[in-house]
Amino acid sequence: MLGLEHQTEPEKQMAVRVIGYEGANYRNQYKAKQITPVITLVLYFGTEKRWQYPQNLKALMDIPDGLESYVNDYHIHVFEIAWLTDEQINMF
């Protein structure tokens, strides 16, 4: 399952949104014999500023000492479309 999230403005809590989308999809697969991977790509089309917000969940948190190893992290995949080099564009 592939999801595309289109963004024209950076969003600080995007990792939380993507977790919600993917979690809902996995929840729908709860009773399936086999779980299908869910991949969400964030396509950022902003031209005025680069994506400067965290691309993982832990970076959004203030985790107390000693608990970090118990907190699951989650990474999102952000592609800054307007900032691709000509070389990168030619790969497609």
Walk through the language-model features, giving the residues of each.
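Conserved single-residue anchors adjacent to enzymatic active/cofactor-binding motifs
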Residues: 1-92
